[in-house]
């Protein structure tokens, strides 16, 4: 499996992709691209995406390719998201092993999912995106590897890991007023995300950390 991380437009990536493919000889490629083209030029580069997919299969005809759309921010990216599934389907209909990954289905919260720069994802946002990648790819990857065991959930449950204990925001093994205070300070932006355990702070498992989680934790503490 090859993963190349590089900021750039579709033409910039296309100018390097042949070398990357020949150097790394991947079985699987994850392609998440085109957002920079839209932001830099204001135009949807559908033709560029289509040509890049063809270029990948020309160099590596037997590769398995996953092509993703974008989380719905900024608003302009939605017009690009609208054309990606059709391009992928066209290639699949032509016999290419290409699959669409719908990252736009993220339960998006701009307040928690976007980083300080107002554009890229925060740790919370990337965690959500990683779970969607997992959801759309795991069964196909297992089939490629010849595995048949059931697909596990992308999000751990309290029985999966001793670190998962809802309300234990500071990971001290207890759920008490210290966790409530820390969670409240995070909501008020007194401390940053590195000060809390995101999984344990998301009390209702909706992918967001907000006043609702504060209320749930408060009710739990009052019952205790």
Swiss-Prot record:
Gene3D superfamilies membership: Dockerin domain, SGNH hydrolase
Known EC number: 3.2.1.4
Entry keyword annotation includes Hydrolase: yes
Keyword hit for Hydrolase: yes
Catalysed conversion reaction: Endohydrolysis of (1->4)-beta-D-glucosidic linkages in cellulose, lichenin and cereal beta-D-glucans
BP-aspect Gene Ontology terms: cellulose catabolic process
Top EC group: hydrolase
Keyword vocabulary terms for this entry: Carbohydrate metabolism, Cellulose degradation, Glycosidase, Hydrolase, Polysaccharide degradation
A GO molecular function held by the record: cellulase activity
Disordered as annotated region, ranges: 147-168
Domain Dockerin: 162-224
Pfam families per the UniProt record, alphabetical: Dockerin_1, Lipase_GDSL_2
Function per UniProt: This enzyme catalyzes the endohydrolysis of 1,4-beta-glucosidic linkages in cellulose, lichenin and cereal beta-D-glucans.
Entries under PANTHER family matching the protein: SGNH HYDROLASE-TYPE ESTERASE DOMAIN-CONTAINING PROTEIN, THIOESTERASE 1/PROTEASE 1/LYSOPHOSPHOLIPASE L1
Stated name of the protein: Putative endoglucanase X
């Amino acid at each position: 499996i090859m993963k190349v991380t590089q900021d750039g437009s579709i033409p910039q990536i296309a100018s390097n992709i042949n070398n990357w493919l020949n150097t790394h000889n991947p079985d699987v490629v994850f392609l998440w691209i085109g957002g920079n083209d839209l932001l830099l030029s204001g135009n949807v580069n559908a033709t560029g995406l289509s040509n890049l997919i063809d270029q990948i299969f020309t160099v590596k005809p037997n590769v398995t390719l996953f092509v993703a759309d974008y989380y719905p921010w900024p608003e302009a990216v939605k017009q690009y998201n609208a054309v990606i599934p059709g391009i992928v389907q066209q290639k699949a209909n032509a016999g290419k092993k290409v699959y669409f990954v719908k990252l736009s289905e993220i339960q998006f919260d701009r307040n928690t999912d976007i980083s300080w720069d107002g554009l890229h994802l925060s740790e919370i946002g990337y965690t959500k995106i990683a779970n969607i990648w997992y959801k759309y790819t795991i069964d196909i990857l297992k089939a490629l590897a010849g595995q048949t065991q059931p697909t596990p959930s992308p999000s751990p449950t309290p029985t999966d890991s001793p670190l998962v204990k809802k309300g234990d925001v500071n990971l001290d093994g207890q759920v008490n007023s210290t966790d409530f205070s820390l969670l409240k300070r995070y909501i008020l932006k007194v401390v940053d995300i590195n000060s809390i355990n995101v999984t344990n702070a998301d009390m209702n498992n909706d992918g967001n950390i907000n006043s609702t989680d504060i209320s749930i934790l408060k009710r739990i503490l009052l019952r205790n």
